[in-house]
Amino acid sequence: NPKSHEKKDHYIDMMVEIRKSKGMTREEASLLIEDPLYLGVLMIKNGDADGEVSGADHATGDVLRPAFQYVKTAPGISVVSGAFIMILQDKKFGEDGVLIFADGAVHPNPTDKELAEIAVATAHTARAIGGFEPKIAMLSFSTKGSAEHELVDKVVIATKIAQEMAP
């Protein structure tokens, strides 16, 4: 419960310190920390949580705003992305029934570099959350070069960049 969390005052202090250059006051932080999205992000930032599951009841922008403000991106990753985790009853698909789909909600048309970073970040998510070595698939509407199009080229280039980033 954000209103009665035992570390609420500590998180408020963190918020003020991190956002002081933006003029964050203790009063503003006291109001924001009552939002579970902000509390979750501050718990992650402080090492009190490993992640946050959200988005079903909140707009993507509302979910990402606290993360942009307090957590930032991992080293070497300049773009924020989301992931969907599906756990199937039929264990023959994915990794023992687990599939992770990258960024179906944040970037409608990522650049090749952004697409590569999304793939690398999602692979990290698979290792951290799923505990398995992921197999990455980049999808386009071309099968083994059957179509020539700039969107197909972007996926090919993104695949090469991702392989260079995480061999």
Sequence positions of predicted segments:
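Anion-binding alpha/beta catalytic cores of soluble intermediary-metabolism enzymes, centered on
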Residues: N1-P167
